[in-house]
């Protein structure tokens, strides 16, 4: 059997050499391995996933204990930033059995990282990387640390790799020197051979070239050609799908430039500025769904104030669409109507009638910026002292489309889950939330959320292990919010009073100060809630809940990165701290959190969590009105595991926070993406948002 496999593998390896008499050098694709890194079969190369790429890989045939085992691997991978890839992996032999009885002895959840060292040596063909597999946790089934280098040749599509690893895998894979070769004779075919520190392996990989599938999606499959390990019972193979989370929309100056129809529509829109009136501008803004529209002038500058409730992925989109419409309607005639004498315009973006950002620019300069004929260095963003400035404006129109008593009905899936536990690979309680958010007076709103259970696994059913965590059919939240901003110190505050978590009545206050640039933010959250009943459903005395949390956030929009430190008393009464690093892929936020907290008279407990927050609503929602129905702009999916302990017992509630869908950061400050630096970094997105809007207007 082994000899037959060797002959077949050798023939397969030699065949591509005869496909052509000359080799054309091309970039060798970076593909997944059967372990938690990009690479060959069991060994890595020094490449990494591209920034913003999400990949899912299903694999069978893993090195565990003293053999290659018939195990399933479910791997989720991210290109966090240039050079760094992160992996979360579930390894299991069984999906539903209780491991306290029998599930094949393994059900493992782990995290892994690989970092490609920045190329400071000046040789593009040579790369180095460092990595760690199965980081932290209490049971490190596949723990491996490694360093690897690879070299790509110019004369042929070949990449050689060599490295050294320290591994706790009993089979010995990557515990010592390892190396391999990747050969890509065709744009869709790759063949690899490796020495994994114990045996030789070879695989063939088929993949879709870039641009073959829509939205730049790529797919790949890998199958074992040969292995020196005993694989009679289980061959090694994997299948993967990769999706880029970052498009050219937010930062590309060439976005839609090659669309002749769009450019013609843009030219037509910009010609309106010469003859347009103030009433035409107001009508255009109202027709696009903007509310609280008002026009005036201040210091010979035309002023437009409005509120965006339609573009909910990012307030920059609403700002960009509004600026595009204004620049196409605010010509000399319109400026003269409001008493202005220059072609400067300042747009104030409101949130529930409260100003949150202004942008000031020369309108002709901005028109050239939109059509791509020139850059515009005249765009100025301001986030401080906006209310005081608005009070000085000489308004020439009444407020149009106030939006008072209008409501948003926001639908969102909800899930409580347990991942890769002894009770199953994935246990869940699935529900649908419907959140009615009604605008009242300036800064005030009523917020009511209902939870409707839809489905649950057996362990969330009655008498199941997670029974107490299953969703119930209830009004889960009913609150009155009031936002205000303190003058002079420019501290924003929102007070919320009412019902949370179905059974608790009380109040919550959140305060935040932003630096003008937005690089620094300091927040304080205080809350106190009482249970509506003296005893819970199990007959135990209920406890009051309170939080007292201080937060510091550092933002680097040029890196699409934020760091947050939170410390204090959490919802369940435990005291400690959280450290979170967040990376933004356009409007998708991927975060990793380390937390350490303790209850009174207990030891500290450490956890690591990974979360993904993504918009589940269209880029351009339905137009606001008496009732606007939309999806959740920041749906949160997260997984947590214990670290720093010899055991990994299930734990619930430590580090728990009072999460509010309608928190101040989400409703007023663009999910924390705020400050002049952030808006300055996203000027191209302003332009592209308007162009994207125009594509919706083309018949």
Language model segments and positions:
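Bacterial N-terminal signal peptides that target proteins for export
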Residues: 2-11
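Outer-membrane beta-barrel translocator domains and adjoining extracellular loop/strand segments
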Residues: 67-69, 98-103, 141-143, 171-176, ...
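Short, aliphatic-rich beta-strand segments
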Residues: 54-58, 300-308
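Flexible, glycine-rich linker and terminal segments associated
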Residues: 27-32, 37-39, 188, 192, ...
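Transmembrane beta-barrel domains of Gram-negative outer membranes and organellar outer membranes
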Residues: 26-141, 152-156, 166, 204-206, ...
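Feature captures outer-membrane beta-barrel proteins of Gram-negative bacteria and organelles
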Residues: 47, 72-83, 106-121, 130, ...
